[in-house]
Curated annotation (Swiss-Prot):
This is Holliday junction branch migration complex subunit RuvB. Its EC number is 3.6.4.-. One of its GO terms (molecular function) is four-way junction DNA binding. InterPro entries: AAA+_ATPase, AAA_lid_4, DNA_helicase_Holl-junc_RuvB, P-loop_NTPase, RuvB-like_N, RuvB_C, WH-like_DNA-bd_sf, WH_DNA-bd_sf. Residues 202-273 are annotated as: Small ATPAse domain (RuvB-S).
Amino acid sequence: MAIISSSLDESNIPRSRKELRLVDSKIIAEEKINKNLNLARPNSFKEFIGQEQIKSSLKIAIEASKYRKEALEHTLLYGQPGLGKTTLALLISYEMNTKCKVASAPSLERPRDIVGLLLGLKEGEILFIDEIHRLNKLTEELLYSAMEDFRLDLTMGANRGTRCRTINLPKFTLIGATTKLASISAPLRDRFGLCHKIELYSNDELHQIIFNFATLINLQLENDACSALAKISRGTPRIALRLLKRVRDYAQVIKNTNKISLEIIEKALNSQKIDNKGLDNIDRKFLSFLNLNNNHPIGLDSIAAGLGEESSMLEFVVEPYLIQIGFIMRTPRGRKLTSLGKKYISSRNEKY
């Protein structure tokens, strides 16, 4: 049973502003309100490119729910940022022919915030909570009975004025999205009947996504240019579309054209200091730092101190792609370059 207290700390914790990386898969403010990106969202599973296994499983679950005339089981979607978790949640609501209310866990600071959302739901509707691993303890505990028994157990007041109240809720579906599955507590995680990992996209899938978006924003994108952009998009549609928009800016302003060739792609990305491997300055500094230390294993905290970056940012944002393309490896003693990574950074003759 959760307790609603008037003594909750409602202060906001300020966040330091970070330099924008075009190859960072996290969403930025501009993309949250960009109409073109919203238009690029598919309207059905048929239009959604990639994630075939997940789509197949979800279709079966949705059809089974319709057959039984029940709400879909609570669903947890996890994976790296920018892979389409929000889009999938909206498509589920479309396929279920119901409404979807969208919220972000950091905005649900007080228990009454989640209570208001739950009380506003109707039978069969969907509540989507992004970054669900960031729910505070009191808010999370309110969800336990709501998810399992479709009721709210509230304790209001204090001391002798304390009273308990149970409010029945309509049967709804909670869809949670997270980039950090391990950060979700076991009691919350166990209440999701469906759990799916959103995988990185193949180059062919990204090629199709980029081509479709280019057509949407009236760009004539040559096939080899599209392929080149797909290869450096880190398996992430959000990065692919962000890079395409920067290429469009370069083509229209510098070249006065909407026709995108491979040459324009290369020049546009070079102006943003992104090379043909999709690496930016931070990636190259990371590799150079390892190279300058004679490729001895180095601890993450030491690398972070040397580069002036947060160790968590390096671990979760920079390292995954460098490991994916085989440029670095993690060892018990620290990080070190692979032969591929050493060859790459040595050929550039760059110094940290």
